[in-house]
Amino acid sequence: LDGEEINIIVNHWPSRSGGEKKSSPYREAAGRLNRKIMDSIIKINPNAKIITMGDLNDGAYNKSVKQGIGAKLKKSELKEPRDIYNPFEQMAKDGHATLFYRDSGDIFDQIMVSQQLVPADNNDYGSFKYWKAGIYNKPFLIQKTGQYKGYPLRNQNGVPGFSDHFPVYIYLVKEVK
């Protein structure tokens, strides 16, 4: 990215088909594999900047993310190069969602950043650093009527839409010289 090496891992983890409990081991395995990939990158370069992202089909609080990846809720919890920050965990705690199922919202779509992308202080922007994250849920992406009012506007019954998940994003910023 602008000459700066940033490692990006893109995920789409196994669905919850068959039930959350029955399918959870598959996502837990995906979380462990994700952690293994990140650790391999860090072993080669302890200063590696890593972004792992995608539709995890699990929330930030699930075992696959908390234990499998080892994601941290707060930036202040990042102590070593292998630590990874998940800004979407706090958003979930605050009641935000990227998808809805049976009128219950959750955030399965997440972007996490390694310690090397989190600024150590407010002056640490000589290279790309994480600034903020969000859920892109503009009005044109939201179902306006019917049973799924308020849900992401998806293609269904011949009505064009976008997706059953709202997109997520992060800002990486760098000092301009």
Residue ranges and their predicted role:
Residues 17-27, 52-53, 97-99, 156-157:
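Second-shell loop/turn segments in exported
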Residues 30-53:
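His/acidic metal-ligating clusters that form di-metal
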Residues 13, 55-56:
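Active-site metal-binding loops of divalent metal-dependent hydrolases
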Residues 1-17, 174-177:
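Beta-strand-turn-beta hairpins that frame and shape the catalytic cleft
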Residues 5-7, 27-30:
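Alpha-helical membrane segments in multi-pass integral membrane proteins
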Residues 42-48, 58-177:
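Metal-dependent phosphoester-hydrolase catalytic domains
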